[in-house]
């Protein structure tokens, strides 16, 4: 059952990044995409907790894939576009370093969070994504 769920998730990631991302990104700039995709991802991560049967996860997992699939490349595009051309490489390198550090933290604190409640990691991660979304949409330089 777990293998089928991960296969299904992988299929949706491939569809999102292989078929949907390019045409959508060609028509819509990164900021409006991020306004929607970050919100979708935060809600979808927490939405994983809602189904009481594994079969219902098949309805939620595409939302996670869509949120993640549109957020990551558009965040990178936004960072690249905001950087001065002479600093792009350095800024993208710093971004990668921060991203790597951010991926180090969940395994370090995950056990503690799971010990509090088995649902806590999804609630905490979804909350942080929603906090990032709120910070993003509140930033004056990204308002239309």
Task: Show where each model-derived region lies.
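Helix-loop junctions at membrane interfaces in 12-TM secondary transporters
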Residues: 49-61
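Helix-to-loop junctions at the C-terminal end of transmembrane segments
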Residues: 16-30, 114
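Loop-to-transmembrane helix entry
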Residues: 1-14
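Intracellular juxtamembrane helix-capping segments at the cytosolic ends
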Residues: 70-83
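A membrane-interface helix-boundary motif in multi-pass transporters
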Residues: 112-129
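Structural signature of the two symmetry-related core transmembrane helices
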Residues: 32-47
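Multi-pass alpha-helical transporter architecture, strongest
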Residues: 125-144
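A late C-terminal transmembrane helix in Major Facilitator Superfamily
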Residues: 88-115
